[in-house]
C-alpha cells in the first residue's frame, strides 16, 4: 500500500471518527435537554394541580358556608365564628369569610338602631368610598342595600369594613348583581385590599327557606344574604415545597371573571438570560387552562434553558470522555500509520 493510500485511509478514518464523536455529543445534548424539558413539564403540572386544588377548595368551602347560613340563628355570631374557624383552618390561602345581608332602604334607620343596641354601639351603614377616601361615583336610587355584618377572622385592620354597603364597592357591584338569584358562585375582579395586598372574592347569594318575623328582621343573619370568600392572590403562589425548577422559570396566572378577562392573580419573573443561552439553547413554554366553574384560570409558563443548567457534573464527565476519545483514536491511528509507513520503507 502506497503512502498516499495510507494517508487517504487515515483521513477517512479521522473524518469518520469525528462524525461518530459529533453524533454522540449531539445525542448526549439532546438527552440532557429532554431531561430538562421533562423536569419543566413536571414542575408546571405540579403547580397547575396545586392551584386547581385550591380553586376547587374555595368552591367547596363556600358551598358549606352557604349551607350553614341557611340554618344559623339570626344573631348566633358565636356559632358562625366557630364554623368559619373550622372551615378555614386547613386552608391558609383563604383570607377571610364575610357575610352581607339585604336590608330594605326603608328599614335602614330601624336596622342601625337595633344593631347599635344589641351588637355594636357605634355601628353605622357606610359607603366604601367614605372609608377609603376615593371619589364617590353617582349611584342610582335603590330599594335595598347590602351591608357587611360578619367577618372571620375579625382582623383589627379590617374593622372599618363592618357596615360597608357592598353595592358601593366599585369592583363588587357588578359581581353582586350577577350573584342575585344565581345558584352558582360568582367571582369578582382582582382588587387591592383595604388593609393591603391583592385579593379576589368568591360570592354567592343565600336564601332562607323561612321568612324572618319580628326581631329577626333586624338580626345579623337575615332572610337574604351574600356569603363572601376572600382569597389573597399571593397565597395561591407555590409554597416552600414547590419544585426547585419553579425558581428558574417565569410564570403567571390570570383569572377570567365576568367583569374582566385579564385579572392577574400572581406572576414570577425569571432571571435575565445570556445571549449564548438565547441563541443556542431552547426556550420551553407551556400553558394550562384550569376549567373551574366559577374561577376559570389560565396558567402560562416559560423557561429559557441556560448553559449552567445543562453543564452538570455527569454531563461534563461524559463530554470529557468523548473529548479524550476524539483525541486518542486519531493519535493512535497516526502512530500506527507512521509505524506501517516506516516498516514499508525498511522493506524497500
Question: Which sequence ranges carry the predicted segments?
Answer:
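Intrinsically disordered, low-complexity regulatory regions flanking sensor or DNA-binding modules
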Residues: 7, 118-120, 313-314
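Membrane-proximal amphipathic alpha-helices
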Residues: 29-62, 69-77
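Extreme N-terminal signal-anchor transmembrane helix of membrane signaling/transducer proteins, especially
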Residues: 2-34, 317-331
Amino acid at each position: 500500500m502506497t503512502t498516499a493510500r495510507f494517508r487517504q485511509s487515515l483521513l477517512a478514518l479521522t473524518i469518520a471518527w469525528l462524525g461518530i464523536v459529533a453524533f454522540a455529543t449531539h445525542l448526549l445534548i439532546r438527552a440532557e435537554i429532554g431531561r430538562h424539558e421533562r423536569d419543566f413539564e413536571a414542575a408546571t403540572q405540579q403547580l397547575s394541580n396545586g392551584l386547581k386544588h385550591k380553586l376547587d377548595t374555595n368552591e367547596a368551602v363556600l358551598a358549606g358556608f352557604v349551607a350553614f347560613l341557611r340554618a344559623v340563628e339570626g344573631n348566633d355570631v358565636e356559632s358562625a365564628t366557630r364554623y368559619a374557624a373550622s372551615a378555614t383552618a386547613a386552608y391558609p390561602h383563604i383570607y377571610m369569610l364575610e357575610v352581607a345581608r339585604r336590608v330594605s332602604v326603608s328599614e335602614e334607620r330601624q336596622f342601625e338602631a337595633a344593631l347599635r343596641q344589641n351588637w355594636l354601639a357605634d355601628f353605622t351603614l357606610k359607603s366604601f368610598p367614605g372609608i377609603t377616601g376615593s371619589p364617590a361615583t353617582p349611584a342610582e336610587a335603590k330599594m335595598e342595600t347590602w351591608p357587611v355584618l360578619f367577618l372571620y377572622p375579625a382582623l383589627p385592620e379590617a374593622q372599618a369594613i363592618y357596615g360597608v354597603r357592598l353595592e358601593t364597592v366599585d369592583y363588587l357591584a357588578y359581581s353582586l348583581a350577577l350573584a342575585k338569584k344565581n345558584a352558582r358562585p360568582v367571582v369578582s375582579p382582582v382588587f387591592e385590599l383595604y388593609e393591603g395586598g391583592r385579593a379576589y372574592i368568591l360570592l354567592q347569594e343565600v336564601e332562607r327557606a323561612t321568612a324572618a318575623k319580628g326581631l329577626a328582621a333586624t338580626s345579623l343573619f337575615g332572610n337574604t344574604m351574600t356569603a363572601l370568600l376572600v382569597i389573597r392572590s399571593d397565597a395561591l403562589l407555590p409554597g416552600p415545597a414547590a419544585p426547585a425548577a419553579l425558581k428558574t422559570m417565569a410564570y403567571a396566572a390570570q383569572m377570567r371573571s365576568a367583569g374582566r378577562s385579564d385579572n392577574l392573580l400572581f406572576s414570577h419573573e425569571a432571571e435575565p438570560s445570556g445571549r449564548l443561552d438565547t441563541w443556542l439553547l431552547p426556550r420551553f413554554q407551556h400553558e394550562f387552562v384550569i376549567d373551574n366553574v366559577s374561577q376559570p384560570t389560565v396558567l402560562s409558563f416559560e423557561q429559557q434553558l441556560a448553559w449552567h443548567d445543562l453543564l452538570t457534573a455527569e454531563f461534563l464527565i461524559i463530554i470529557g470522555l468523548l473529548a479524550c476519545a476524539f483525541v486518542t483514536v486519531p493519535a493512535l491511528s497516526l502512530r500506527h500509520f507512521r509505524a506501517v509507513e516506516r516498516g514499508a520503507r525498511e522493506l524497500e
